[in-house]
Amino acid sequence: MSKRALITGITGYVGRGVARRLLEDGFEIIGLVRNSEDDFEKRVAELRAGLGESEKLTFVRGDMTDDSALKDLNVEGVTHIVHSAAVTRFNVEADLAQAANVDGSRNILEFAKGCPQLGCFSYISTIYACGLVDGEVLETRHQGPRTFANHYENSKFDAEALLQKEYGELPWQIMRVATIIADDDHGGVTQQNAFHNTLKLFFYGLLSLVPGKAEVPLYFVTGRFVVDAIAELTQHCERQSIVHICHSQDETPTLGELLNLAYDRFSEEEDFRSRNILRPLLCDAESFGLLVGEAEEMGATLMSQGLGSIAPFAKELFTVKDIKNDRFRAALKDYRAPDPKVLLNAVCSHLIKTRWGKRAG
């Protein structure tokens, strides 16, 4: 039987990587590209350049926020769906998070109901869908009500609840992914996020205070680890299962360790040492809020933009989560965790060498 996968979010980092892996494993791929893009053909050309010319690779227009966008899509032969499309910014607005991440998920779930040959629906979520909780976070359904650091977390919680409550007949599985900080264990970075923005502010001496507690674990993974896991588990689907694509707490660095390691690595650079930059101090949420407010009053500077990407996640840096991954370990054929200090050092080295993407690596 042929394998045919529909991938939403194929223009994104994870979706594109999963498409590449499934193509290698013999899948036919249908990539859903937003029909609101004026440069649809250009985006398709870029995807083909990255994924390779293949008869097994096709693209269709479709906007997940439009409930009629998928009505004309041929469901014949669709055996797998990987729903990775989402707005993942921590500072996403509430209405956009609802439209893209919750309502958009409902639309693709409704489409999935009409796929008679569907064997697996992989929903890509986040380990932070649990919200602002301390202690153990299990690979089970999150019970509400909860509080969240931002609308992104809240929308992922709501989308998970929607999937479990209204679509029990589908062969779904939820994959909660940790923060991707590098492409692979070598530390190369092709897509930056709030983590990299924080280190950038640190390196240039624009971060005197960091919100949080030193003992808070920071769950980091590489893109290759995530893509390989999603591709493998999508092909060996355990219906109505939830897994955490992350490493365990004892394999995870803390906020304090990250700051110390980054400072030591940055201090090897002459231009960093010459500026006599001090190690950032950990502070409470109120003090950090004052810093963000002062930066905003200065206008659109590197500092205000960087802090703006950190602030919506700041509350999480005060919660000590013990993310469990026992089910994930058991399901994966070959689980391996890199040395977190070696990985972080490699990432810092890459960011320094490329000056956060401004120079060739």
Residues covered by each model-derived region:
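N-terminal Rossmann NAD(P)H-binding glycine-rich loop of SDR-like oxidoreductase domains
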Residues: 5-27
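Mid/C-terminal beta-alpha module of Rossmann-like enzyme folds, strongest
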Residues: 233-309, 358
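Conserved Rossmann-fold NAD(P)-dependent oxidoreductase catalytic core, especially the SDR/UDP-sugar
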Residues: 103-154, 173
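Amphipathic terminal alpha-helices
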Residues: 314, 318-361
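A conserved pocket-lining segment of Rossmann-fold NAD(P)-dependent short-chain dehydrogenase/reductase
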Residues: 93, 197-225, 229-233, 244-246
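NAD(P)H-binding glycine-rich loop region in Rossmannoid oxidoreductase-like domains
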Residues: 61-103, 113-114
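Conserved beta-loop-beta element that borders a ligand/cofactor-binding pocket
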Residues: 160-187
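Glycine/proline-rich active-site loop of Rossmann-fold NAD(P)-dependent oxidoreductases
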Residues: 182-195, 233-243
